[in-house]
Amino acid sequence: MDEETRRAVAAADEALPDSDALPGAIDAGRVVFGFDGYLDRVREVVADRIDPESHERLATLEGFGDRIDRSVAADSSLSFEWLQQGSRTGGHTSHLARAFGGWSFDPVMVGMYGDPVHDAFEAEFGEYDLHSLGDPGVTDAVEFDDGKLMLTEIGDTMSLDWAELDAAFGHDRLAGKLDGASLLGTGYWSETPDLPTIFDGLRDLWGDIDDPPETVLVDPGDVRKLDGDRLRAGRKAIGRLDEVTDVVVSSNRAETGVLANAYAGEAERSFTDDAEAVYDALEPTWFVGHGVERSVVVSPDGTDSVAVPAVSNPELTTSSGDHFNAGLGLALIAGLPPAAAVVVGNAVAGYFVRTADQPSLTDVRAFVDDYLEKF
């Protein structure tokens, strides 16, 4: 185990409250999440149908791609059978509200939940402070052992901007929800192309809020969907928002590479170099890149890289990035330093992919306690 990871885990171990002090040792107040909303259908692809009751699963995304390549080479059409293994609410607001609600926070959800609110959101989040701006997206999440394929109908988040947010919810009303909150989480730029206009609007609004959140957590999402011109045009909005509050941007390994190429030019770079290039371009307080093998955080204190405990047979990988962000947000509220915060993000995501379930605060603490033993 590398010394950098050992130091990060030691810092997390020292800064995170002990299990017997949880949850009371963390100030679990209001948290606000916007501005998406999805209905996720978790699916698997059939490789071979044995009989009406049994089949073999197509296990890898590579194998899925090979079948497509062979079909293209043969100039032939192709069909797949897929099966739905479950369904749930999804997106940034749902996943983070679910996690923070389980940790005894008071989530405020402002996003796309339907009009009237769809039964799935009402059943799960009806006791939360939930406000719908429009229709949710629908995602078919196909799970493979080596990755996942997400097929998405975006919903009304695609057309959301600062003016539309005012019309659908109200800027003054949003300011009231943010007053006294400990965190604002936003996602995803990839599904809300005009999200930078909301960042600029928040910057102007911030001074009118008596007690605004100390941190805004930004998840850009799968920015491969956005062209380079849009990425470059929107980047300064994050730096402008960071002038009035701490902005923490969190992307996965692939997304970090796309952002680095857009801002620093196409090049072969390491994960760390990509993260540093994005930090220099966006000018947030922290930039965090999370990956399967390592997670990286760039801050005014420098760059830290933390190894991630691998899992050979994950129960569920869809939304692992959102769970990383939930852990990161928890660490930000608890005041952890950058490397330690990344350890907590890895812990929440690591628990989730191993169990397909939400960790309690005690579970998070236990994962940190055993972090080095999981390698």
Segments and roles (model prediction):
Residues 73-84, 301-313:
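Glycine/charged-rich beta-loop-alpha catalytic/anionic-binding loops adjacent to active sites
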